[in-house]
Amino acid sequence: MSTHRNQRVIVGISGGVDSSVSAYLLKALGYEVEGLFMKNWDEDDGTEYCTALSDLEDAQKVCDKLGIKLHTASFSAEYWDRVFEHFLDEYRAGRTPNPDILCNKEIKFKAFLDYAQALGGDLIATGHYAQFSRFGEHTYLMKGADPSKEQSYFLHAVPGQALARTLFPVGGLLKKEVRRIARELDLITHDKKDSTGICFIGERKFSDFLKTYLPAQPGKIVTDKGEEIGRHQGLMYHTIGQRQGLGIGGLKGYDDAPWYVVEKDLDNNELVVAQGGDHPRLFSAGLTASKLDWINGVPAKSSFSCYAKTRYRQPDQLCRVDVQDGGVRVTFDKRQRAVTPGQSVVFYDGARCLGGGVIESVFK
């Protein structure tokens, strides 16, 4: 077994099973391991929403069991400034953002990394299902081994310099293997439910949360032919491809086919819907994206073919990427369904994640 006794690793301990097993694996390899519990949200901390208090208790029990020290730190101010305000700005603009990606870039692999350095850490580690490959001076982000949990999509904006100081101990394992290890160690987190959704929203209704910060602007729901068939409470509560929660079922003069959101008309504050999950207006030939993050630098070629995802867990889609000033134009081999401005498009060369950007617009 290789040893790393001269290297101190600060593990982000969330109170979940993945980070718990990550800490164990690193200690077993001989690293000097300490944990850090990050608190990123201060607005409310009831157990029905964010579970920071119970998560901290679980994190402490895991560290006690493993015999490692647990530090705690609040990055709430950084989260508000660098992530949450951007989240609100995007919704004001009628887009659908993904705060987890920005949180990884700005908090988990920047604020946390800086804090870990101050603690004397040589490296950081997280429980993400991703891997890395090193070649010369470059560190490449690679897909995790478990296709059902693979998380490189959320890590595409993390710069290569940060990845070079990061370990992903469970990235080469399947989730069931991680739970088995935790169960054999009798860790309190071995059967803990995976966290889902955005932490600061938790299990509450999304529209109720958003109303707390942004005033609703009701408007018309219109068909793809321009006929008004209902009212919406705010475009920000809806996303492209949405079927549930429109409140327009059983309309006279229309068949029973389900309605889907195909456009958010910001100029007229209208929600445009069409019937059928395969309606042509749900599909796009390509997209434009900005705010590009290339993990290992801008590609040498201004035009190249690769694979891309426009949402988490989507199968890789073959495409052509044309690099332009300030962004890219992406043309897919096959038309893509429900491509959503504000979400991220992430590029791959096989198992290697190249980077990605924020979707600005689509073209049909």
Swiss-Prot record:
Active site: 103 (nucleophile), 199 (cysteine persulfide intermediate)
GO biological process, one term: tRNA wobble position uridine thiolation
Region entry Interaction with tRNA, spans: 149-151, 311-312
Residues at which ATP binds: 12-19, 38, 127
Keywords, alphabetical: ATP-binding, Cytoplasm, Disulfide bond, Nucleotide-binding, RNA-binding, Transferase, tRNA processing, tRNA-binding
Molecular function GO terms recorded: ATP binding; tRNA binding; tRNA-uridine 2-sulfurtransferase activity
SS bond list: 103-199
Transport found in the keyword field: no
Cellular component, GO annotation: cytoplasm
Positions of region (Interaction with target base in tRNA): 98-100
EC number: 2.8.1.13
Catalytic activity: S-sulfanyl-L-cysteinyl-[protein] + uridine(34) in tRNA + AH2 + ATP = 2-thiouridine(34) in tRNA + L-cysteinyl-[protein] + A + AMP + diphosphate + H(+)
CDD domains, per the entry: MnmA_TRMU-like (cd01998)
Interaction with tRNA (site feature) positions: 128, 343
InterPro entries: MnmA-like, MnmA-like_C, MnmA-like_central, MnmA-like_central_sf, Rossmann-like_a/b/a_fold
Subcellular location: Cytoplasm
Role this protein plays: Catalyzes the 2-thiolation of uridine at the wobble position (U34) of tRNA, leading to the formation of s(2)U34.
Entry's family note: Belongs to the MnmA/TRMU family.
HAMAP family named in the record: tRNA_thiouridyl_MnmA (MF_00144)
Name this polypeptide is given: tRNA-specific 2-thiouridylase MnmA
Upper classification of the organism: Bacteria, Pseudomonadati, Pseudomonadota, Gammaproteobacteria, Oceanospirillales
